[in-house]
């Protein structure tokens, strides 16, 4: 499975998963988007805008594609009219009328995709069973559509394609006989799924009657509304047909959600210029009036006389805009994530009765989004699997988190963006975001803004999204916001605006079995080329695809639903999927997002990942993958905070390397509080490579807020590493030397550096149990200052590290250092016997370094003492034995022995007492 840049994908839907590629859609490859400055630059200046039909006149292939697209649309219009007429004749309910707006037939799953026949078929339709040939032109539409006669649809065996098969009543197609249980008319897979749904009843459905059906219908209507709004702004759009579809859609919306949606939409459409046929708007008004006639409490007001009303789905609640004190009530009733398939002109919408929520996965849904039963402002989670991790209190910035805002601007192109777009967004958000990054992609324009701001700002934005959107429209009179349709989504809240006025504000229920979500992405950190494995819910449903977003570039996953038909029906609803995604990163260091675009066409979930050129850094960050599997836990939330924060830091560092020094704003520097959270997180896990990367970024000018010296003095990293008893981290810090302005800074972390209370790392190690390894590393620093400070460095109370070890009873520490001290002078002050003193002094002065006069540090010598001695004194091949100390000792012993022997062999004379003594006269034995 490969990935391409989105603008290069041929024949793939670029908006909402609808059929074909919009012939007038702008190409992402023709524009360069600066996600930090919110500026779009056209790369191909020789061609006009992609919305102009003149830009493709010379391209025969594109013109042919346009002609085919027009034919497809005309066929869909005809199918829609036939479907509506049939529904009216059969007096079907408004749900079916609405769900046929897309021009597709709705039957059970697995239906073979064919177009509805609006008139006499061009050729006779026969049964597909071998040697049958039954004419199906006058039979039921069901049999015509599936090309099977009534007899063979109920037969136990039928020869199709030379293979004995049987027609499945639920799949509406033939299967081999091995797929059926004895006596069953449905295949084993479909029957098992059907029984599973029947056994597991949904409490919401039981308690609320048709609530699930209403939610499902509203979801289809909302998705159809998005499609119609997109088609309206296409040059190939049939305006009259779109308006007719919109009329029927609004009729169904009114019947489902009350008068307020329809009345506001009608008023706005009458006053706006989005649709050109005024007579159709009048028909729409009459239609809505007829729909609301049975209601006696309706009060008719003109648009100018009626105060602005906010629309809440399924609640018919009315509020005046200035009065914001009353608590807003929102009912989960709309869901963009239900199935909507329109991949080609012969595709039907596959719909069955809404199955109950799967209890096996309902708990997972609850953990993924606790906002189902609580207001947005009281929950720490949202609909996106990656943004629902709230920062931990250890970060020092506990009330801030990273999330995103998604705009869909209908009928707009990149050249419609104002120069001050970023300033308009910041003014709208009251300059609360500390970090902000944006992406655009086709589909009119889908503008995604990832930002980090405090929790109170997110709460205010989501609690009253219509008020927030109206504030944006009031602050800016730019046509980008005030002309045409606008769609806004924040977490699970969405709002629509038309011609500068908000017409819809509702919540998306995430309990739907069609909801798609990313749970984890592996690997969490990648280098240049990556092979991702995405784990999520309903990733392989029709109409879904994965997007990899890196520095403004969208890489699209192809063949999202590969192997979909071979999946067991027992795993179709809210089951865990694994999808592979291969791509090559366009950057060496930074952060990217994995997004999923569901049936509604907008990305419903995202997950961040890190890009680094150092494989060791990636391997350390990947250790968080197992932690993130346990979604909803504190450790998983803290891990996600780290990914977001280090992603923002790497993004700033990469941005700083691209921009000139004059472009840096001191207010945009990364705060020390956030940097401290990254340091502490890496220190707790002993990530030496990540720590080294963070320290290198610290010494980059224009990235982190304070000066490096002030930051290091406050962080006391070596003290932290000693307290963690981490020898690898201590060794890394002692040898760390960043390069700054072509100069290497050495000795930043010293064992004798005084911290709080005058305590040095040596004091801390001497007072801790089991710190032999750390103490060994501290006394082996490159400058050898640790071994000297063992007896000399004193804290505020006057105690040395040796005193701490003695008081704690750590005599092994004292012996460890003493052994090093005893070895040091022997290795440096060894003198050979009988070397002339004058030479010794001169030679030692020549080899003495400046450091020897003030410290006991060992200096590096090229050769050993013995080789140095040989080089100076070797003048002849015959050496005297006197220069051999061992030989001298042996000679001395021999001389002593000879003297003793001679003494006892002589005849000493003892006067006045005995006769002269002789050895021969000496007797032995007892006397």
Swiss-Prot record:
Q: Region annotation Disordered: residue ranges? A: 191-213, 343-400
Write down the species. Answer: Arabidopsis thaliana
Report the GO terms under cellular component. nucleus
Q: List the biased-composition ranges (Low complexity).
A: 371-399
Q: Which PANTHER family does the record associate with it? A: SQUAMOSA PROMOTER-BINDING-LIKE PROTEIN 1-RELATED (PTHR31251:SF132), SQUAMOSA PROMOTER-BINDING-LIKE PROTEIN 4 (PTHR31251)
Q: What are the BP-aspect GO terms?
A: regulation of DNA-templated transcription
Q: Tell me the domain comment.
A: The SBP-type zinc finger is required for the binding to DNA.
Entry keyword Lyase: no
Gene name of the encoded protein: SPL12
Bias regions of kind Basic residues — which residues? 191-200
Q: Which InterPro entries match?
A: Ankyrin_rpt-contain_sf (IPR036770), SBP-like (IPR044817), SBP_dom (IPR004333), SBP_sf (IPR036893)
Segment Sufficient and necessary for DNA binding: which positions? Answer: 124-200
What's the cofactor?
Answer: Zn(2+)
From the record, which residues define motif Bipartite nuclear localization signal? 184-200
MF (Gene Ontology):
DNA binding; DNA-binding transcription factor activity; zinc ion binding
* Function field: Trans-acting factor that binds specifically to the consensus nucleotide sequence 5'-TNCGTACAA-3'.
Q: Name one Pfam family in it.
A: SBP
Q: Does the keyword Cytoplasm apply?
A: no
Q: Where are the zinc fingers (SBP-type)?
A: 124-201
Which locations, inside or outside the cell, does it occupy?
Answer: Nucleus
The name of this protein is Squamosa promoter-binding-like protein 12
Q: Which UniProt keywords apply?
A: DNA-binding, Metal-binding, Nucleus, Transcription, Transcription regulation, Zinc, Zinc-finger
Question: Bound how, and how many: what does the cofactor note say?
Answer: Binds 2 Zn(2+) ions per subunit.
Q: Which residues bind Zn(2+) 1?
A: 127, 132, 149, 152
Name the predominant localization.
Answer: nucleus
């Amino acid at each position: 499975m490969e990935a391409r840049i989105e603008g290069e994908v041929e024949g793939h839907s670029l908006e909402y998963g609808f059929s074909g590629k919009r012939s007038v859609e702008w190409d992402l490859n023709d524009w360069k988007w600066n996600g930090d400055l919110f500026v779009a630059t056209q790369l191909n200046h020789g061609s006009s805008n992609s919305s102009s039909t003149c830009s493709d006149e010379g391209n025969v292939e594109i013109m042919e594609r346009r002609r085919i697209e027009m034919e497809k649309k005309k066929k869909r219009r005809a199918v829609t009219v036939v479907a509506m007429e049939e529904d009216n004749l059969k007096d079907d309910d408004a749900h079916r009328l609405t769900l046929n707006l897309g021009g597709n037939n709705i039957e059970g799953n697995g239906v073979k995709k064919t177009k509805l026949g609006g008139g006499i078929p061009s050729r006779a339709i026969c049964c597909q069973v071998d040697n049958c040939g039954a004419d199906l032109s006058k039979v039921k539409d069901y049999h015509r559509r599936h090309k099977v006669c009534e007899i063979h649809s109920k037969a136990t065996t039928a020869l199709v394609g030379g293979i004995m098969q049987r027609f499945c009543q639920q799949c509406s197609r033939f299967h081999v006989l091995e797929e059926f249980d004895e006596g069953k008319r449905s295949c084993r897979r479909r029957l098992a799924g059907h029984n599973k749904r029947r056994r597991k009843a949904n409490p919401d459905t039981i308690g609320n009657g048709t609530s699930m059906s209403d939610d499902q219908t509203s979801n289809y209507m909302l998705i159809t509304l998005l499609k119609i709004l997109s088609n309206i702004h296409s040059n190939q759009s049939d305006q009259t047909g779109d308006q007719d579809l919109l009329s029927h859609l609004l009729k169904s919306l009114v019947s489902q959600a009350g008068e307020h949606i329809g009345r506001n939409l009608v008023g706005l459409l009458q006053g706006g210029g989005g649709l050109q046929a005024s007579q159709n708007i009048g028909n729409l008004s009459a239609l809505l009036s007829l729909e609301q006639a049975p209601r006696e409490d309706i009060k008719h007001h003109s648009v100018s006389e009626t105060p602005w009303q906010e629309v809440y789905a399924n609640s018919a609640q009315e509020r005046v805009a200035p009065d914001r004190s009353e608590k807003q009530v929102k009912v989960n009733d709309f869901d963009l994530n239900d199935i909507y398939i329109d991949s080609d002109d012969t595709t039907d919408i596959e719909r069955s009765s809404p199955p109950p929520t799967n209890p096996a996965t309902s708990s997972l849904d609850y953990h993924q989004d606790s906002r189902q039963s609580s207001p947005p402002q009281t929950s720490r989670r949202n609909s996106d699997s990656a943004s629902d991790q709230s920062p931990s209190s250890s970060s020092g910035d506990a009330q801030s988190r990273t999330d995103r805002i998604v705009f869909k601007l209908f009928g707009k192109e990149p050249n419609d963006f104002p120069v001050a777009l970023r300033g308009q967004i910041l003014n709208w958000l009251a300059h609360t975001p500390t970090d902000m990054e944006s992406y655009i992609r086709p589909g009119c324009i889908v503008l995604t803004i990832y930002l980090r701001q405090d929790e109170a700002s997110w709460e205010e934005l989501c609690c009253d999204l219509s008020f927030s959107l109206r504030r944006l429209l009031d602050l800016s009179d730019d046509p980008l916001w005030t002309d045409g349709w606008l769609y806004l989504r924040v977490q699970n809240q969405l709002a629509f605006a038309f011609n500068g006025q908000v017409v819809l504000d509702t919540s998306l229920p995430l309990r739907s079995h069609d909801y798609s979500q990313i749970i984890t992405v592996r690997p969490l950190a990648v280098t240049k080329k990556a092979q991702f494995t995405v784990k999520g819910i309903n990733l392989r449903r029709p109409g879904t695809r994965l997007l990899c977003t890196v520095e403004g570039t969208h890489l699209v996953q192809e063949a999202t639903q590969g192997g979909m038909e071979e999946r067991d029906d027992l795993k179709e609803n809210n089951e865990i999927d694994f999808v592979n995604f291969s791509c090559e990163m366009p950057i060496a260091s930074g952060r990217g997002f994995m997004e999923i675009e569901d049936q509604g066409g907008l990305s419903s979930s995202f997950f961040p990942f890190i890009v680094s050129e150092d494989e060791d850094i990636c391997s350390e960050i990947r250790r968080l993958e197992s932690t993130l599997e346990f979604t909803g836990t504190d450790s998983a939330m803290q891990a996600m905070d780290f990914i977001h924060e280090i992603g923002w830091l790497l993004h700033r560092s990469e941005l700083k390397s691209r921009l000139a020094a004059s472009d840096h704003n001191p207010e945009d520097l990364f705060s020390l509080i956030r940097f401290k959270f990254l340091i502490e997180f890496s220190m707790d896990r002993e990530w030496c490579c990540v720590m080294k990367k963070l320290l290198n970024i610290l010494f980059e000018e224009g990235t982190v807020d304070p000066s490096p010296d002030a930051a290091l003095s406050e962080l006391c990293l070596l003290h932290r590493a000693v307290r963690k008893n981490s020898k690898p981290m201590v060794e890394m810090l002692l040898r760390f030397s960043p390069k700054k302005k072509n100069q290497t800074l050495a000795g930043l972390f010293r064992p004798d550096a005084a911290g709080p209370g005058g305590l040095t790392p040596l004091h801390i190690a001497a007072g801790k149990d089991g710190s032999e390894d750390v103490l060994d590393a501290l006394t082996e620093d490159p400058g050898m200052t640790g071994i000297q400070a063992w007896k000399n460095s004193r804290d505020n109370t006057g105690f040395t590290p040796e005193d701490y070890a003695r008081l704690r009873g750590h005599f092994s520490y004292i012996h460890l250092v003493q052994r090093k001290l005893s070895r040091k002078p022997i290795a440096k002050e060894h003198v050979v016997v009988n070397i002339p003193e004058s030479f010794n002094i001169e030679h030692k002065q020549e080899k003495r370094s400046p450091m020897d006069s003030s410290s006991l540090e060992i200096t590096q010598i090229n050769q050993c003492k013995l080789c140095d001695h040989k080089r100076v004194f070797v003048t002849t091949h015959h050496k005297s034995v006197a220069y051999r100390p061992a030989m001298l000792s042996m000679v001395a012993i021999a001389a002593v022995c000879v003297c003793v022997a001679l003494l006892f062999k002589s005849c000493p004379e003892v006067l006045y007492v005995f006769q002269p003594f002789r050895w021969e006269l000496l007797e032995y034995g007892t006397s």
